[in-house]
Amino acid sequence: RHSDPARRGELSVCDSISEWVTAADKKTAVDMSGGTVTVLEKVPVSKGQLKQYFYETKCNPMGYTKEGCRGIDKRHWNSQCRTTQSYVRALTMDSKKRIGWRFIRIDTSCVCTL
């Protein structure tokens, strides 16, 4: 909820949910070349290892947006809320067992398409 009185009552065109996802949850992803890579659970650092986390946002399947985008006139437009993806860097292993930092696709937003 917004604390600014001028913004009260504002609703997004599409409902979304965001959550932190670990590499253990993700397991595999698609890299920039379109290949499937294994997402490594831990990243080696000087004092041990750190877990990889990704902040993902996607359309909420339980939200209002099942019937189209909020605020779009259904008599004139056919609208749909869709999850879009962006690339982020992650420590991964490819099919040839090569480990390295690659850009992978993750869910990052929920947008309205007409």
Curated annotation (Swiss-Prot):
Listed GO CC annotations: cytoplasm; extracellular region; perinuclear region of cytoplasm
Annotated GO MF terms: growth factor activity
Transmembrane segments: none
Reported modifications of this chain: Mature BDNF is produced by proteolytic removal of the propeptide, catalyzed by a FURIN family member. In addition, the precursor form is proteolytically cleaved within the propeptide, but this is not an obligatory intermediate for the production of mature BDNF. Can be converted into mature BDNF by plasmin (PLG).
InterPro entries: Brain-der_neurotrophic_factor, Cystine-knot_cytokine, Nerve_growth_factor-like, Nerve_growth_factor-rel, Nerve_growth_factor_CS
SMART domains per UniProt: NGF
Function as written in the Swiss-Prot or TrEMBL entry: Important signaling molecule that activates signaling cascades downstream of NTRK2. During development, promotes the survival and differentiation of selected neuronal populations of the peripheral and central nervous systems. Participates in axonal growth, pathfinding and in the modulation of dendritic growth and morphology. Major regulator of synaptic transmission and plasticity at adult synapses in many regions of the CNS.
Oligomeric and partner information: Monomers and homodimers. Binds to NTRK2/TRKB. Can form heterodimers with other neurotrophin family members, such as NTF3 and NTF4 (in vitro), but the physiological relevance of this is not clear. BDNF precursor form: interacts with the heterodimer formed by NGFR and SORCS2. Mature BDNF has much lower affinity for the heterodimer formed by NGFR and SORCS2.
Family: Belongs to the NGF-beta family.
Name of the protein: Neurotrophic factor BDNF precursor form
Organism (species): Macaca mulatta (Rhesus macaque)
Gene: BDNF
